[in-house]
Every structure is written in structure tokens, then in C-alpha cells.
Amino acid sequence: MNREKTLVKNTAILTVGKICTQMISFFLLPLYTALLSTEEYGTVDLLNTLVSLMLPIVTFQIEQAVFRRLIDNREKDEEIKKIVSTTVCTILVQIIIYVVLFLLISPFINNDYKYFLLTNVMACIFSSIMLQISRGLGDNKNYAIGSFITASSTVILNVIFIVICRFGAYGMLMASLSGNILCSLYIFLVKKIYKYISIKKWDKQLLKTMWKYSLPLIPNAISWWIFNSSDRIIVTYFLGIGQNGILSASYKFSNLYITIYNIFNMTWTESASLHINDKDASDFVSSTMNVVLKLFTAICFGIIGFMPFVFPIMINEKFSDSYYQIPILMLATLFNVMVGLLSVIYIAKKNTKAVAKTSIMAAIINLIVNLGLIKFIGLYAASISTLVSYFAMAIYRYVDVQKYVKIKIDKKFLIVAFIMMPILLISYYINNLYLNIVMVLIVCLYA
């Protein structure tokens, strides 16, 4: 099977596993925003934000190393046992250290939800490790099923805990915890991970090699956390937890969009890693990037174009201020797509230091712009800082990766896209019914 067919096949498998439940979760947004207050919604979002910060710090990003290492050793059973054993044994020790430190610090944390920061971090670590082992072994089918179990069980339990039991924020956090536990158990049993685990197979030298790959990804992950999550903390501090709930609702549309891209990105990472040293690698990368960028630009413009019609249906009126942040976050996420396409080149070349460097620079830009503007323009500071930093990182990475592969982006496409962008934004904020209909028709023609 050639590279393109393999890429399409793997993407299709992962899409079935992820997009269905993501769509269900998305369409339950009116339910969540109706039954939860902005404060409750903001609290859940803030705790999930802290969980995402703790993950790379606790794991040293070793789940990324196990995936990359397994790709090169799929046919070597003994090497697989060594990689899995080293990863699992190491992560268990790291989790024990995290538990001890948390229990020492917890008496000083005055929050009703604090223990979810312990349990949800542990559950997310195990599900992430299991999923990356499955993916590293080339079993995208079970990776997709595991992801489906996480998402579907979380959605179902959210409905039970929030609608029936009326547990509020506790319900959402318990649902997330349960979903990750079920995913971990599924992969562990179906893939028979226990057969690969032996303390005797733990390898110190291998661990050093894996950490050499994964440690530079920690600042990268924290930088991504700054992009995606520090906004919430800054907004909560300066504007209040209710405004964080508004921002969280704004992100739901761009989060769905980037989820669709991330499904492709997983298979794109694998494909690029396998073929980065081919003679025609530059042509392969360029053609793939152009097709994907055109597709996701059309999707982005389509979401913005239809948003004036969809928003009143999807979002409760107490979250109405989130309307104004959505197009800015959508455009920021479009540049994030470009960043993701380019970052795969670094991963394929095992140059994780370059990934970290560019991410840190952009994260600093994000913080400076956000902190500099939030007192003057309020919630807009969070979305604008995200847009500026993603744009800066996309431009830098595009120039920087040329030393590995020569990438050419269709100039005609770029010109049309940059003409469409301001026209679409003007129409969105004027929010005139007839003008919105015209823009939807133009977007459809563009697509």
C-alpha cells in the first residue's frame, strides 16, 4: 500500500473512533450550558486546565517517546518488551512520587475539588500510555476504539451525573475520570499489555535514550499549555471565574475543529516519520500540506460563516458574550493547524529541541500580549494573544523546516484566503441577516 493510501486508511480508522463521540459531546453543549452556571463551567474548565499542566511534568512526556520508539521496532518482540517494560515501570515510580508530593501539599489547598487533581491526572496518564503503546505498535483500530470508549463513556456519564443526579461540576469531573479508567483497562486487556511487562526487562540505557527524546517535549508541552490554558487562569484572576466560563464556551467550536485536525495529525506523524528520508520527501510533504491546508481553511471559514445561525441554538443566552471570541479563536486554530503540520517534520527528524524552542518563543509572546492587553480590552486579550502567537509560530516554523524539506505552499490559495478573512470577520461582527446569508454562499463557493 503506498504512502497516500496508508495515510488515508489510518485517518479514516481514527476518524470513526473519535469524531462520532466528539460530535455527540459538542451537540450536548446546549445541555451543559443550560444546567451549569458560568461559575461551575469555569471551575471544571480550570481544573481540567491544571490536569493538562501536570501531565507532562509528571510523565516527562515519556508516552511520546514510547510511541516514537515502537514505530522503529514493530517487528522485534524482545525490543517491544524492553520498551514497554521500561516505560510502564518508570511511569509507576513517577506516579508514586506525584502522589506523595500531592498528599504533602494538599492540606494547604483549600478547594472542594482538589482531589480530582490527583485522580484525574493518574487516570489520564494511564490512558495516554496505553493509547500510545497501541498506536506505536501500529494498531490504530484499537487506538480508535480506546479513544471512543473514553469519549462515549464520558458523554454518557455526564448526562447521568448532570441531568439525572444533578451533581453539577462534580459530575463532569467524575465522568472524565471514569472515561479514562475504562479506556486504560480496555487497551491493557485487549492488547495484552501485561505480557510485555517485566521488571527484568527494565533498561536504564534505554530510559536515558527515551528521556533524551522526551525531555525537550516538556517545555514544548508546557508552552502548549500556556497557549491553550494559561488564558483561563489569567482571565479568572483578572476578570473572574464567570468570564472563564464564557471563554470556555467560546473554545468549544475551535476545540471541535482542532480535534478533527488532530485525528489526521496522528496518522500524518506516523507517515512522515516512516518516509521523511525518501528521495521525494519534499514533494510528498508539500502536496500533503497544500491539500490539508486548503481543506481546513475551508472548514474554518465555513464554521465562522454559519456561526451567526448556529450560535443561538447551541449556546444558552447567559453565555452570549462568547459569540465575539469565536472567530478570533477559529483563525488562531487555523494557524495552529499549520503549526501542527510543520511540527511533524521536527518529530520525524527526532529534533524535539527545535519543537521546544519554537513553542517556548510563541508561548512567551502569548503571555506578553495577554497580560499587556487584558486590562484594556478584557476577554478579547485572551483570544487575540492566542491568534498572534500561533501566527508567529506558524511563520517561524515554515521558514525553519526548509532546512529539512523544501515545502512550497500554493500562493494563489494564500492570496484568496487572506482576502476572504477580513471580509468574513466584518460580516460576522456586523451580524446582519442578509449579509450573513451572502457570506455563507460565498464560503460555500470558496470551499
Predicted regions, residues:
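Interhelical loop/hinge segments that connect adjacent transmembrane helices in multipass membrane
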Residues: 1-3, 7, 115, 169, ...
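Hydrophobic alpha-helical transmembrane segments
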Residues: 145-193, 361-365, 379-400
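Alpha-helical transmembrane segments of multi-pass membrane transport and lipid-handling proteins
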Residues: 23, 58-59, 64, 85-115, ...
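Transmembrane alpha-helical segments of multi-pass transport proteins
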Residues: 362, 410-447
